[in-house]
UniProtKB/Swiss-Prot annotation:
Its cofactor is [4Fe-4S] cluster. Its EC number is 2.8.1.8. It comes from Synechocystis sp. (strain ATCC 27184 / PCC 6803 / Kazusa). Pathway: Protein modification; protein lipoylation via endogenous pathway; protein N(6)-(lipoyl)lysine from octanoyl-[acyl-carrier-protein]: step 2/2. Keywords: 4Fe-4S, Cytoplasm, Iron, Iron-sulfur, Metal-binding, S-adenosyl-L-methionine, Transferase. GO terms for molecular function: 4 iron, 4 sulfur cluster binding; 7,8-didemethyl-8-hydroxy-5-deazariboflavin synthase activity; lipoate synthase activity; metal ion binding. It catalyses: [[Fe-S] cluster scaffold protein carrying a second [4Fe-4S](2+) cluster] + N(6)-octanoyl-L-lysyl-[protein] + 2 oxidized [2Fe-2S]-[ferredoxin] + 2 S-adenosyl-L-methionine + 4 H(+) = [[Fe-S] cluster scaffold protein] + N(6)-[(R)-dihydrolipoyl]-L-lysyl-[protein] + 4 Fe(3+) + 2 hydrogen sulfide + 2 5'-deoxyadenosine + 2 L-methionine + 2 reduced [2Fe-2S]-[ferredoxin]. This is Lipoyl synthase 2.
Length: 303
């Protein structure tokens, strides 16, 4: 595949968010559909990454009566340079009724496949691993036919470091989600700038451990392009993911949420995403979603 086509994107000004290309603009969705999902969520005082992360696909997903639930509050103990979720060092107490509320929302939305994610909670003794399990158990109790995908942080932090991190990953893996997602987000060279508090190898370890613990669980990871990565770096990252047995992949475009976030360095074109998607398939990923508006849980239940 010729690589010249990847080099056409120019660097963009750092002073302000540049105008979005036409392929990144999405319809909002019908008000009635948006209102139904939002009411179910707001009435139960639970959170979704769709809202907290200002996902560009939330109109489409809400129209299909789906949402990705954000567990353990909306304040994150990390400060990743790309993420819209609120940051802080004094997160809220856990809502002990959250498992029931999420399970009820799953039932009301009629979800047969649900994605659970969370803020990073480095303040909790187990990083929140046990909370994922508690929510999963309640969903299964009330919705026995519903399949569950999880998207977790790296569970690094607190005491014990690597040993504790591995135990936390095992805790969630033992609960047997149908798919376990942990995002690398960017290439190795840009990890420090994009993912403060995270490490490239540490995230690869998470994905490797899952497969070691339970080879039957699908593993998944994703990258947000547009931080200044090169094609060669992206391909090398995909190879690293395959080396730890990662099954599924998402590739999407980073869009700067505000002036306080990292600026976009390049808008990758739909054609470039298609080319990367073909490379990923050739490398052996069983499921690939690659496009400017693709996000971690986009059409997740259709994989």
């Amino acid at each position: 595949m010729p690589q010249q086509s990847f080099m056409n994107g120019s660097s963009l000004p750092r002073e302000f968010p540049p105008r979005l290309p036409s392929w990144l603009k999405r319809p909002i969705g019908r008000a009635s559909e948006l209102s139904t999902v939002q009411q179910i969520i707001k009435q139960r005082q639970i959170h979704t990454i769709c809202e907290e992360g200002r996902c560009p696909n939330r109109g489409e997903c809400y129209a299909n009566r789906t949402a990705t639930f954000l567990l353990m509050g909306q304040i994150c103990t990390r400060a990743c340079g790309f993420c819209q979720v609120e940051k802080g060092q004094a997160p809220m107490m856990l809502d002990q009724d959250e498992p029931r509320k999420v399970a009820e929302a799953v039932q009301l939305l009629g979800l047969k496949y649900v994605v659970l994610t969370s803020v990073a909670r480095d303040d909790l003794t187990d990083g929140g691993a046990g909370w994922f399990v508690a929510v999963m158990e309640r969903i299964r109790q009330d919705n026995p036919a519903t399949q569950i995908e999880v998207l977790t942080p790296d569970f690094w932090g607190g005491m014990g470091r690597e040993r504790s991190q591995k135990e936390r990953v095992l805790t969630v893996t033992k609960a047997k989600p149908v798919c376990y997602n942990h995002n690398l987000e960017t290439v190795a060279r840009l990890q420090g700038k994009v993912r403060r508090g995270a490490k490239y190898q540490r995230s690869l370890d998470v994905l490797r451990w899952i497969k070691e613990f339970d080879p039957d669980i699908f593993t998944k990871s994703g990258l947000m392009l547009g931080h200044g990565e090169t094609v060669d770096e992206v391909v090398e990252t995909l190879k690293d993911l395959r080396s730890v047995g990662c099954d599924r992949l998402t590739l999407g475009q980073y869009m700067q949420p505000s002036l306080d976030h990292l600026p976009v360095q390049k808008y990758w074109t739909p054609e470039e995403f298609d080319q990367l998607g073909e490379i990923a398939k050739d490398l052996g990923f069983s499921h690939v979603r690659s496009g400017p508006l693709v996000r971690s849980s986009y059409h997740a239940g259709e994989d």
